[in-house]
Amino acid sequence: MKKKFITSSFLLLIGGLITKLLGMIIKIIISSRIGINGLALYMLVLPTFSLLITVSQAGVPLALSKLVASSNKRPHELYSTLLLFLGVYNIILLFLVLISANFISTNLLHNNSCYLPVIGIAFVIPFTTLSSIIRSYFIGIGNMLPPVISNLIENFIRFIFAYYLLGFFTDYSTSIIVFIIIIFNIVSELISTLFLLIFIPKRKRRITFNNSYLKEVMCLAIPNLFSSFIGSFTYFLEPIILLLLSSSNNISIDYGILTGYVYPLLLLPTFFVNATAQALLPILSNSNNKNTNKLLRFIIFIILLFSIGTTFVFLLFGDKLLLFIYHNYFGFKYLRILSLFSFFLYIQPIFSIIFLSIGKTKYIFYTTLVSSFIRLSTMIIFLLFDFEIYSLIYSFLINVFCTFIYQIYLIKKEDILLF
């Protein structure tokens, strides 16, 4: 068990590190090419992108990995059934987004420039869903190499676009540039998906449909969908509420700085936690608590040390990191505040995997529901007292701490000894 976990963790850790670094480089290049106004527009539509991806995937990827890892059903029949189902579902969703794009940009985001980016998002989501399903299949069977390499290929293609091709479009309007950035995801997703298909034996590429498999997957996926949807919907509402309740004329710029500069840097270390969580899922799904408690305690201890280290780095060298990465100091004061609660943020994926592995997907839903309520309600309260962008920052801190306490309560309820 430990050997498999170490091997899987190592592959995901290295792949996650390279992917995060490539992603950071891509963000640097894009932000320098499109400027602060372009970045603000891009970050304004990003929550919509996240919400639609969540809806398009319907909570299936995690459920597929869980069932493939823990059941004796034929894995290829599981994923092919889901490909057919989600293929039809995503085509319907694409047309619905195209029809409602004008309403989303005008009435929700209050910015007509968001129209073209939303159109771009509609065409990207089916390709994102396709690659996500195939990656989840490989994670479920414990073969981490194909998804790791496909992620690297996807980000390398995006890097080539950002570095070599994006410069040809800088004379266009901000709306068109953001549309092009979003629509290029189709190319990167398609190439990475074709690479994944190489690792699937030809005899297993035949598409079949099994209705009983679909029902079983959806029973596990629906709680995941509700959980992910609530989280993404909360993220989607944040800029809408900020624009609605804030009296500052620069709130969209401040939001772009926070979500475009600070959050990516704060979340950069999560490659370590996400890699560990993904590697844990197949192992926890096939083990009992007695065999895994010791391993889980060790992992939490490592994440604690890791979080303390990142906090000190952000506090002492955050301004230098921002200058080195983005060539400006925008958001340093935000970063210093947010880094103080990094442990409570970084530990959450581990808890979610624990809940999934013991079949308590409802706990993930409860956690997301509590988290979203705390985040939105506290943000609204702070906005009413004119805290402006700090409303989002303070609500973020309160949210991650309260969510951590609630997750500990749920874990103790299941007699899992982590501390």
List where the protein language model places each region.
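Short membrane-interface helical motifs at transmembrane helix boundaries
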Residues: 92-112, 169, 309-328, 332
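Interhelical loop/hinge segments that connect adjacent transmembrane helices in multipass membrane
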Residues: 1-2, 174-182, 197-231, 413-419
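Membrane-interface helix-loop junctions in multi-pass transport and translocation proteins
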Residues: 141-146, 156-194, 359-362, 372-405, ...
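Residue-level signature of transmembrane alpha-helical cores of multipass secondary-active transporters
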Residues: 12-16, 50, 86, 120-121, ...
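Membrane-water interface segments that mark the loop-to-transmembrane alpha-helix transition
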Residues: 58-102, 290-310
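Membrane-interface junctions at transmembrane-helix termini in multi-pass inner-membrane proteins
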Residues: 127-150, 340-369
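Helix-loop junctions and terminal segments of transmembrane helices
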Residues: 57-72, 266-290
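Signature of the first transmembrane helix
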Residues: 4-62, 94, 98, 124, ...
